[in-house]
């Protein structure tokens, strides 16, 4: 094989791997949350909220607090999808729940990633996918609530308007 062919294949492989996985050039969000609650309580609140917002009717007054679909759930891991009501874009959502403090506290690592391979910006949609579930479930008012994220970890986080997205 000629060097130019190998070079072309190498460049295409690197370029393809960047677009097929979430990375800095892909619309996504990673958030860490901490609660002074057992993970079972956090798990139940999130799963209940995902199920509550499964139909389009909960978006009748605007926003995107609808069309969530629970994929799988255990007290340690929740997987869901969110479909935007207008453009029908799909985002993959995961919550990993880890107990600490003799099972009295919960650390949640959450991620939302756009399935649309060419999505680079998202107006904070992936952040709102996660935050809206936290707020809707009442967990933002829970004891010990703490959120850690940034624009580096969440596409357009600082400009997100979660009443719209």
What do these predicted ranges mean?
Residues 2-5, 9-165:
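Ser/Thr-rich, low-complexity intrinsically disordered terminal regions
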